[in-house]
Amino acid sequence: LTILKNGVNTEWISTVNFNLRKPNFIIIHHTAQDSIQQTIKTFTLAHTQVSAHYVIGDDGRVVQMLNDYLRAWHAGNGSWGKNTDINSASIGIELDNNGSEPFSEAQINSLLALLTKLKKDYNIPEQNIIGHSDIAPRRKVDPSVLFPWQTLAEKGFGIWPDQVLEQAPTNFNVEQALRIIGNNTKNLAAAISA
């Protein structure tokens, strides 16, 4: 019950006509911190205003920090395709890694198991499993150049080229190709670097 400034009491009558958000993307990050404990502490302090749905430790430990249907604060300013509010449409997964070290086998195995569950539960298309650097090129570099995207793509998570072309086909339009897969090409150099 709330009393409004004009003295009127609000009345609560619940409805069954609502739903929670449905995640359509998974954004993969690295923590840029030195331990899973440090990341968990950062994500539980109100003043940091940063969070993720899951954190995966170097040892493969998976910590869920937020219900999948709720909006975490992991993506910040970025876009993919026409979606400019990535936090509202995605699940954020942070990998405990400072960005300069290889990702452990245990960590990647846990990530693959979690992605299998999330992709099935929410019917997330494989091309919608992307990195933070994809949605915020030049601003973010995670999950780092050491992240095994090819391994994930071979398991059905994310995309990876079947072959590397030595030369682009005649009349190939880089900007159009990047836009088709979801990149924001307002800053073409940034989109290419992502």
Give residue spans per PLM region.
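Active-site-adjacent loop/helix surface patches within enzyme catalytic domains
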Residues: 1-127
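Basic/polar, cationic surfaces and motifs that engage anionic cell-wall
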Residues: 99, 103-194
